[in-house]
Swiss-Prot record:
Cofactor(s) recorded in Swiss-Prot or TrEMBL: pyridoxal 5'-phosphate
InterPro entries linked to this entry: Aminotransferase_I/II_large (IPR004839), HisP_aminotrans (IPR005861), PyrdxlP-dep_Trfase (IPR015424), PyrdxlP-dep_Trfase_major (IPR015421), PyrdxlP-dep_Trfase_small (IPR015422)
GO molecular function, one term: pyridoxal phosphate binding
A Pfam family annotated for this UniProt entry: Aminotran_1_2
Similarity-based family: Belongs to the class-II pyridoxal-phosphate-dependent aminotransferase family. Histidinol-phosphate aminotransferase subfamily.
Record EC number: 2.6.1.9
Protein name: Histidinol-phosphate aminotransferase, chloroplastic
Localisation: Plastid, Chloroplast
GO cellular component terms attached to this protein's record: chloroplast
Length: 413
């Protein structure tokens, strides 16, 4: 005899019984008394299908291609058989000078690394307000600008919504859109890498996308968006996310303050390039008050680590160092550009950033060039996308890095 007990709670306690004829007996607790059937029951293990872990994964993620990151020093060192200090790393736009000395001192003097960080990053946001001239209530910090890109999408996009992407550009926008179940409408850039504003306007009118991601200076070509172009796009009924990861090298003023007058503008910044803190992952953004309220609700509470906040605040205390490093990189960018123009199989593009995009010409294979340089200990970036087929990107390093690159390139002509 099997018994199914209905507990007097919101949950149901169920005991399994064979198919049966049932009667209900009333007592202090409701009981269903079941007479077991004499019909044989098929083994449960035979009825169940084998369940694998991927059955629990959201369907759209099953087809997601992983993001292709740059290999770290440790992996490169093993693969190339070289010490990290013997590798000329010009493939990830990192700041070769590193952070101000105050950063290392501050990290070594951290008193409470065992305590959770301030969920509002108050000290950092106050320092950023002083640095940018924008009040701290408009600023939100993150574990790198990448986290903020994902946070924006999680707050703005429903599955099936659309974003506008303007390739070639930073591929994280397309990747995060796919992770969040959104569709990407691509509006390719013009041959000179400028934005096709007319086509963007047409797409916004007919497809009704939620947001557009723009990078200025753009990665990977180093072009900038002028104020007139940006204002035209801001006039459209779409949320504009302006990524200014490289703005310090452009000579242009940041648009962070614009969020006070444009309700559809978000501006993202980072400490990775300017302050040499790529390994500590700390970025920030400027948001209209009507938007930032909801990002505060949705963000992870302890997203900026104690170490990241300490390092970023220490870096901001030495603006002279940051300025000197910026000037050094801009000067080296111009020198590198002129030297690359002398290479018969490279056609470099003018850049407002800390990298230079080059078209590989004269029958030279771009991927093989990248691989051959790697065997010599020099790393540059090669792309597989159709927009950048036949291109390589070279980060600006120190003068000695430029010399090492040029010495290796001369092996090919």
């Amino acid at each position: 005899m099997g018994v199914i007990e209905l507990c007097n709670t919101s949950s149901i306690c169920i005991g399994r019984a064979n198919p049966s004829c049932c009667s209900i007996e009333r007592n202090q607790r409701r009981r269903i008394i079941c007479m077991a059937s004499s019909v044989p029951v098929q083994e449960e293990s035979q009825q169940k299908q084998r369940v694998t872990g991927d059955a629990f994964i959201r369907p759209h993620l099953l087809k997601l291609s992983p993001y292709q990151p740059i290999l770290p020093f440790e992996v490169l060192s093993t693969r190339l058989g070289r010490k990290p200090e013997d590798i000329v790393k010009l493939d990830a736009n990192e700041n070769p000078y590193g952070p101000p000395p105050e950063v290392i001192e501050a990290l070594g003097a951290m008193k409470f690394p065992y305590i959770y960080p301030d969920p509002e990053s108050r000290t950092l946001r106050a320092a950023l307000a002083e640095d940018s001239g924008l009040e701290s209530e408009y600023i939100l910090a993150g574990c790198g600008a990448d986290e903020l890109i994902d946070l924006i999408m999680r707050c703005v996009l429903d599955p099936g919504d659309m974003i506008v992407d303007c390739p070639p550009t930073f591929t994280m926008y397309e990747f995060d859109a796919a992770v969040n179940g959104a569709h990407v409408i691509k509006v390719p850039r013009n041959p000179d890498f400028s934005l096709d504003v007319e086509r963007i306007a047409e797409v916004v009118e007919h497809e009704k996308p939620k947001c557009i991601f723009l990078t200025s200076p753009n990665n990977p070509d180093g072009s900038i968006i002028d104020d007139e172009t940006l204002l035209k796009i801001l006039d459209l009924p779409i949320l504009v996310i302006l990524d200014e990861a490289y703005v310090e090298f452009s000579g242009m003023e940041s648009k962070m303050k614009w969020v006070k007058k444009h309700e559809n503008l978000i501006v993202l910044r980072t400490f990775s390039k300017r302050a040499g803190l790529a390994g500590l992952r700390v970025g920030y953004g400027a948001f209209p008050k009507s938007i930032i309220e909801f990002l505060w609700r949705a963000k992870q509470p302890y997203n900026v680590s104690v170490a990241a906040e300490v390092a970023a605040c220490a870096a901001l205390k030495n603006p002279a160092y940051l300025e000197n490093v910026k000037v050094a990189l801009v000067q080296e960018r111009e020198r590198l550009f002129n030297l690359l123009k002398e290479v018969p199989f490279l056609d470099p593009y003018p850049s407002y950033s800390n990298f230079i995009l080059c078209k590989v010409t004269s029958g030279m294979d771009a991927k093989k060039l990248k691989e051959d340089l790697a065997t010599m200990g020099v790393m540059i970036r090669h792309y597989n996308s159709k927009e950048l087929k036949g291109y390589v990107r070279v980060s600006v390093g120190k003068p000695e890095h430029t010399e090492a690159l040029m010495k290796c390139l001369k092996h090919f002509y």
